[in-house]
Amino acid sequence: LHKEYRRQRQMCIRDSRDFVAIKVDREEHPDVDGAYMAAASAFTQNLGWPLTVFTTPRGRTFYAGTYWPPEARQPLPAFRDVLAAVNEAWTLRRVQAEESADAVTDALARAGAAVPSDLPDAAALAGAAEAIAAREDRQFGGFGGAPKFPVATTLGLLQTPLVRRKAPDAAAAADRALAAMSASALRDADGGFFRYATQRDWTVPHYERMLTDNAQLLLVALDAGDESTARGIADFLVGTLRRDGGGFGAAQDSESWIDGQRSEGGYYLRPVTERAGLEPPAVDGKVITGWNGLAIGALARAGSRLGEPTWVAEAEDAAAYVLQVNRDTADALVRASLDGVASQAIATAADVALLADGLFSLAAATGDPRSVSYTHLRAHETEADL
């Protein structure tokens, strides 16, 4: 969002004496973010960033929302007016607010405790794939309308052998989506994919490039047999996101300095021949454990399948770095590190699972089972208590 909006939003909270503002780093604490995102779903269907959650002193959510502008703009109230209304509700109708918070918390607890009796069978998975494919944009490829995201998990599901056998039309929709994305402005000349396109035809991207998206899209391209796209993504991971000290950075910024001014996408809009004289967008150097697990697995599999041992070697180097650096003083995995300094946030269950999956793929590519040694993971030391 625009910097002016962020500034005014921060000023509104700072000037109010009725709230205690706590800012959550989503990359450091995805578990906290996920919990409050789930709670916010009780109040709005438009989930995303920025997320503002109003809680009781016990941390239970009684109201939430995403974007509120600095000044009222139909149908959205001004953020300052939202603060005033929430404060009035808490002051004059506190019992109802607390009851609402308890109801949301209880509903989420029940949903989290529900365990399906059986895993979905082949028919259920094929049915899900067909339901996704029914939303295909037949004109421009992909699914749904603007904004359009290259949802690698969706494409990966549609590419599974089961779906290709049971719902071949759905698998074909995934192949068409990848082809459309690869030929569009969503993919940069150096091979990496941007975060999303603001238009239905995959134009006008948001120019940030994420490690998670590109690592997963590498596997999508690999499974689709699109060697050119796969090679481009791998080259982007190794050439741009890899950190000199080791591991892969979290993302490359969307903005860069062009002619003395910060420009959204300005670097990427220049011809490749002109980029050599420009400073490229900065890379977020945080080496996130789970995200690196995705990259390790993707590069190991791609390198093995396409005959690129250097990619496998890069995966080995990243694995060694994460297993050595992303640890606390008790030798437990942490969420991330920056410039060789480990974060204080303990690795989540997802971090452990993604890293383990990446190490299994690395072991398969190298033939070295030491990659998946249990002593490397120390999963029982993590917050997940696996």
What function would you assign to each model-found segment?
Residues 3, 332, 385:
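Conserved beta-strand positions that form and line the central face of beta-propeller blades
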Residues 301-304, 309-311, 321-356, 362, ...:
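Long, K/E/R/D-enriched contiguous segments that form extended
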Residues 1, 6-10, 14-298, 302-306, ...:
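Replace the tail clause
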Residues 379-386:
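A short, hydrophobic C-terminal helix/tail in secreted or cell-surface proteins
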Residues 370:
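Phosphate/diphosphate-binding loops
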